C-alpha cells in the first residue's frame, strides 16, 4: 500500500491530489489547489513551498509525482513554471520523499487514452477512475491524474518484476524504480 502525492505546478495555481494505491485499487484521499496572490515571484514560491509542506504533513505520502516542464513559446512563463516546480520539489525532498516526473502528454495518455486530451476530458476520467461524486477543480484533477499515472507506473513495475509483495512495501518499490531509472527520476515521454 502506498500513498502518492501528485502535483500540477503553476506559479499562480498549483494543484495537488493524494491517492492511496493498494494493488490495483486506487482510493481518493484528497485534492485541491494552492493559490498564490499576484505579489512578487519569491513570495509566490514561498507560498507553494509552504503549501506543499502542509499537504505532506497532513497526508504523509510515500511518493511524490510531479509534471515535467513543457517547452513553452514564452520563455518567461517556462522559467516561472520551473521555479514553481522547484519550490514543490524542495518541499518533497526535505521530507525525504522520492520524486518522480511525468510528461503532460504521458499523463493524458495514461488517464484518458489520448495524449492531446483537454482539461475537461482529464477531469471526467479522473472522476470515473476514482469514483468521485463530483468533478475536482481542473488543476486538482491534473494533479490527481499525475498521481494515477505514477500508480500505473508502479503497477507496471510490479508486473515486470513479478513481485507480489511490492504493493505492501513502498520503500521496496521506490528502490526498484530508482534502480531502473536514473537518479530516482522516472521519465517517460511520448
Swiss-Prot record:
Pfam families reported for this sequence: RuvC
Residues reported in the UniProt entry to bind Mg(2+) 2: 67
Keyword Cytoplasm part of the UniProt annotation: yes
Top-level taxon: Bacteria
Main location: cytoplasm
Cofactor: Mg(2+)
SUPFAM superfamilies assigned to the protein according to its UniProt record, in alphabetical order: Ribonuclease H-like
A single MF term (Gene Ontology): magnesium ion binding
Cofactor: how bound: Binds 2 Mg(2+) ion per subunit.
GO cellular component entries: cytoplasm; Holliday junction resolvase complex
Entries under InterPro entries matching the protein: RNaseH-like_sf (IPR012337), RNaseH_sf (IPR036397), X-over_junc_endoDNase_Mg_BS (IPR020563), X-over_junc_endoDNase_RuvC (IPR002176)
BP-aspect Gene Ontology terms: DNA recombination; DNA repair
E.C. no: 3.1.21.10
Reaction equation(s) it catalyzes: Endonucleolytic cleavage at a junction such as a reciprocal single-stranded crossover between two homologous DNA duplexes (Holliday junction)
Subcellular locations according to the entry: Cytoplasm
Chain residues that bind Mg(2+) 1: 8, 139
Active site: 8, 67, 139
Residue stretches in coiled coil: none
Keywords recorded for this protein, A-Z: Cytoplasm, DNA damage, DNA recombination, DNA repair, DNA-binding, Endonuclease, Hydrolase, Magnesium, Metal-binding, Nuclease
Enzyme class: hydrolase
Complex and partners: Homodimer which binds Holliday junction (HJ) DNA. The HJ becomes 2-fold symmetrical on binding to RuvC with unstacked arms; it has a different conformation from HJ DNA in complex with RuvA. In the full resolvosome a probable DNA-RuvA(4)-RuvB(12)-RuvC(2) complex forms which resolves the HJ.
Function: The RuvA-RuvB-RuvC complex processes Holliday junction (HJ) DNA during genetic recombination and DNA repair. Endonuclease that resolves HJ intermediates. Cleaves cruciform DNA by making single-stranded nicks across the HJ at symmetrical positions within the homologous arms, yielding a 5'-phosphate and a 3'-hydroxyl group; requires a central core of homology in the junction. The consensus cleavage sequence is 5'-(A/T)TT(C/G)-3'. Cleavage occurs on the 3'-side of the TT dinucleotide at the point of strand exchange.
Family of this protein: Belongs to the RuvC family.
PANTHER family reported in the protein's UniProt record: CROSSOVER JUNCTION ENDODEOXYRIBONUCLEASE RUVC (PTHR30194:SF3)
Name of this protein: Crossover junction endodeoxyribonuclease RuvC
UniProt organism field: Pasteurella multocida (strain Pm70)
Originating gene: ruvC
Amino acid at each position: 500500500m502506498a500513498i502518492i502525492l501528485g502535483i500540477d505546478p503553476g506559479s499562480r495555481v498549483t494543484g495537488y491530489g493524494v491517492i492511496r494505491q493498494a494493488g490495483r485499487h486506487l482510493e481518493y484521499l484528497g485534492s485541491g489547489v494552492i493559490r498564490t496572490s499576484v505579489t512578487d515571484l519569491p513570495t509566490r514560491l514561498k507560498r507553494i513551498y509552504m503549501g506543499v509542506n502542509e499537504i505532506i504533513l497532513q497526508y504523509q505520502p510515500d511518493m511524490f509525482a510531479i509534471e515535467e516542464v513543457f517547452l513553452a513559446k514564452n520563455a518567461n512563463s517556462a522559467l516561472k513554471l520551473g521555479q514553481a516546480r522547484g519550490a514543490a520539489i524542495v518541499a518533497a525532498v526535505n521530507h525525504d520523499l522520492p520524486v518522480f516526473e511525468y510528461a503532460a502528454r504521458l499523463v493524458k495518455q495514461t488517464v484518458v487514452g489520448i495524449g492531446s486530451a483537454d482539461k475537461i476530458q482529464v477531469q471526467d476520467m479522473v472522476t470515473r477512475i476514482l469514483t468521485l461524486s463530483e468533478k475536482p477543480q481542473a488543476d486538482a484533477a491534473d494533479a490527481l491524474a499525475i498521481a494515477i499515472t505514477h500508480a500505473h507506473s508502479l503497477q507496471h513495475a510490479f508486473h515486470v518484476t513479478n513481485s507480489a509483495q511490492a504493493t505492501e512495501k513502498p520503500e521496496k518499490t521506490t528502490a526498484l524504480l530508482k534502480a531502473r531509472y536514473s537518479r530516482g527520476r522516472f521519465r517517460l515521454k511520448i
